[in-house]
C-alpha cells in the first residue's frame, strides 16, 4: 500500500485547485504505471490492466466500482475481454486533483490484491 492509497478523498468543488505541474511530477512517481493524458483539453490519468479473461476483468471492474463509491470519486472504466482501462480525473475542475492520484493508487491496491 502506497502512502497515497492510505489517504481519503476530500470533497472537490469547481473552485478547487488543479494539481500544478510540479505536483504532477512529484505525484506521478508514486503511481509509475499510470500515464497522464490530455483528452478534449482535460488532463487525466490512465492505466490499462491485463487479465486472462472477461470474468476476471469484470470482477476487477466491480471492485474498482466499490472502491470508487467508498471514496465518492468515480473513474471512467472500459471493460473488455482481457483488459480494463481505468481513467481518473476530476470532472468538477476539468483536470487533475490530488483525489485522482489517491484513487489511482487505491486502484493499484485493488489489482494487487487479486
Swiss-Prot record:
Enzyme class: lyase
EC number: 4.2.1.96
GO molecular function: 4-alpha-hydroxytetrahydrobiopterin dehydratase activity
Coiled coil: none
Stored InterPro entries: PCD_sf, Pterin-4-alpha-carb_dehyd, Pterin_deHydtase
Catalytic activity: (4aS,6R)-4a-hydroxy-L-erythro-5,6,7,8-tetrahydrobiopterin = (6R)-L-erythro-6,7-dihydrobiopterin + H2O
UniProt keywords, alphabetically: Lyase
Superkingdom in the source lineage: Bacteria
Pfam families cross-referenced by the UniProt entry: Pterin_4a
One GO BP: tetrahydrobiopterin biosynthetic process
Signal in keyword set: no
NCBIfam families cross-referenced by the UniProt entry: PRK00823.1-1 (NF002016)
Family of the protein in this entry: Belongs to the pterin-4-alpha-carbinolamine dehydratase family.
Name of protein: Putative pterin-4-alpha-carbinolamine dehydratase
Organism: Pseudoalteromonas translucida (strain TAC 125)
Amino acid at each position: 500500500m502506497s502512502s497515497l492509497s492510505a489517504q481519503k478523498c476530500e470533497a472537490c468543488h469547481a473552485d478547487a485547485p488543479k494539481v500544478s505541474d510540479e505536483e504532477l511530477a512529484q505525484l506521478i512517481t508514486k503511481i509509475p504505471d499510470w500515464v497522464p493524458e490530455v483528452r478534449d483539453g482535460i488532463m487525466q490519468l490512465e492505466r490499462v490492466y491485463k487479465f486472462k479473461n472477461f470474468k476476471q476483468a469484470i470482477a476487477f471492474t466491480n471492485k474498482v466500482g466499490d472502491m470508487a463509491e467508498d471514496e465518492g470519486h468515480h473513474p471512467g472504466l472500459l471493460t473488455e475481454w482481457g483488459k480494463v482501462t481505468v481513467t481518473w480525473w476530476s470532472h468538477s475542475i476539468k483536470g487533475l486533483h490530488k483525489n485522482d492520484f489517491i484513487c489511482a493508487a487505491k486502484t493499484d491496491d485493488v489489482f494487487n490484491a487479486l
